[in-house]
Amino acid sequence: MIGSVLTELAAHHWPVLVVDDGSRDATATEAKAAGAAVVSVPFNVGVGGAMRTGFVYAMRQGHDAVVQVDADGQHAPDSVHRLLEALNDADVVIGARFAGEGDYQVRGPRRWAMRVLARALSRLTRTPLTDVTSGFRATGPAALPLFARDYPQEYLGDTVESLVLAHRAGLTIAQVPVAMRPRAGGRPSQSSFRAGIYLLRAMLVLMMAVVRRRSDDAHVAESDSHG
């Protein structure tokens, strides 16, 4: 599965890194055979640790932008250039579903939670966002050192909480509409129950961030009134 994704990416002549997070299958072997650079972590460090590893590697190699692409085939390599182009005007770019392109659908409580998260983050960042849980992302030079140092560890931290982190650092967040493809293989990293728990956790983080922003805004307004 990962071999076919890497073959598609290779057609665009981008340097590709695969972070092998303690897997016990042939991921590293297939990735090397497809021409990708591979960093193998000897034990599972989780999504946050794997992402930090990738960001650190990119900086050490002198790259000024990183695009995250899942190995399950959902993220179309043909859309990568659109995310990179959007970095001309933003520091973090989301490849967004539910933005007028493609027919990707989510139903039930998960869809409700995703809408709530998107609306909350849109208010926090003052930017219209439709898909804050998308892992299809581009990170520019201003965000790279931040994410290499402080990328959130937990599931959904790599999506929702990383956007809160970027916003608090004064970075600009944007999205571009993309069409997601059906999962070509693999299984979700979390069960439905655990995913629900993490969604609630992400919503709590967002609520705290919104309250903090309002407090900061009130403090600025008070300072101005005394100025």
Language-model regions: role of each:
Residues 12, 33-35, 169:
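Short, structured coil segments at secondary-structure junctions
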Residues 5-6, 10, 14-23, 39, ...:
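Short beta-strand/loop segment that forms part of the nucleotide-sugar
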Residues 20-29, 73:
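A conserved acidic beta->alpha catalytic loop
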Residues 63-74:
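Short beta-strand-to-loop acidic/aromatic patch adjacent to the donor-nucleotide binding site
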Residues 37, 41-60, 77-156, 182-200, ...:
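Acceptor/aglycone-binding surface of glycosyltransferases and processive sugar-polymer synthases
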Residues 1-4, 25-34, 78:
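Acidic helix N-cap motif at the loop->helix transition within catalytic regions
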Residues 196-210:
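A short amphipathic helical element positioned immediately N-terminal to and/or at the very start
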Residues 128, 154, 163-181:
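Catalytic donor-sugar/metal-binding loop of nucleotide-sugar-dependent glycosyltransferases
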